[in-house]
Regions:
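Catalytic cores of the polymerase beta-like nucleotidyltransferase superfamily
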Residues: 1-271
């Protein structure tokens, strides 16, 4: 990390130091002249994420920009230029020198964006998730026992999409975007790789993955410096995510409702 921050002067010298070209524009006062030395306006119109200088130099100046690229892909729905993706892949380990708090802030912004799946897929594809959220990447190597998806990773992304569909307006039962709900969606099956067992008939089981996953969730969220309440709520949802499976074909008994209410505590029923 650099000891000093240098400021460009004049304006055209400072703008190329920004993270992406779409953020490297300014209006010169008082005549409101657009200053766009890096072609940011054209990239904005094209929906392309590109760096003002080489992506390697930009990410070396501030490695958090690697995460920010994924966040903007999720937030804006932009395509990421191939050179930027290549640099993300090559320099992902540099994120290890960035404070967990800064990484967490970008991950939060990504998850509550309009297209979080897009950002997560970019993180996994470039290896950024191997550094920030390795449990998600590991799901690509785990078969979906229900054979509805290619692997548990694809299943997880589908669950994220479905969870977002459950979100409501501010006056509804699950006001969106709901960070706790979305975190639980992407983490609910992370216990499967550790609990995978193959039976003689060729089937695969993941007994206890809900409890193992809850512990793994708490550990990962603590490492990312999430607040205690978020850690508690997300890990509890992961632990309870199988609870409804036993009631798919039958009505809940009063005792089942009471047990769930006791175990879930203040978490809304609509979460699970």
């Amino acid at each position: 990390i650099r000891d000093r921050v240098t400021y460009g002067d004049p304006l055209t010298g400072d703008l190329p130091r920004r993270d992406f070209t779409v953020n490297a524009m300014a209006l010169r006062l008082p005549d409101l002249e657009l200053v766009d030395p890096c072609g940011g306006l054209a990239d904005l119109a094209a929906g392309v994420l590109r760096t003002p200088v080489s992506a390697e130099q930009s990410f070396d100046d501030d490695p958090l920009r690697i995460m920010r690229a994924a966040r903007f892909a999720a937030q804006l729905g932009f395509d990421v230029e191939m050179d930027v993706m290549t640099a993300m892949e090559e320099m992902a380990p540099r994120l290890e020198i960035v404070s967990a708090e800064r990484v967490r802030a970008e991950l939060e912004r990504l998850l509550i964006s309009p297209w979080p799946r897009r950002g997560l897929e970019l993180m996994v594809h470039t290896g950024v998730a191997d550094v920030v959220l390795p449990e998600l990447s590991a799901l690509r190597e785990t078969v979906d026992e229900h054979k509805r998806h290619k692997d548990v990773y694809e299943h997880t992304l589908t669950v994220l999409d479905q969870a977002i569909d459950l979100e409501t307006g501010p006056d509804g039962p699950v006001p969106g975007p709901d960070l706790v709900l979305r975190l639980a969606a992407i983490l609910h099956d992370i216990g499967k790789p550790a609990t995978r067992r193959f039976l003689p008939d060729g089937t695969v089981t993941f007994h206890g993955h809900d409890h193992v996953g809850a512990r793994m969730t708490a550990k990962r969220l603590r490492a990312l410096r999430f607040d205690k309440q978020t850690i508690k709520d997300v890990s509890r949802l992961v632990e309870l995510h199988l609870r409804f499976h036993g009631y798919v074909d039958a009505a809940w008994s009063d005792s089942a409702v009471r047990r769930y209410a006791t175990d879930a505590g203040p978490l809304p029923v609509s979460y699970t």
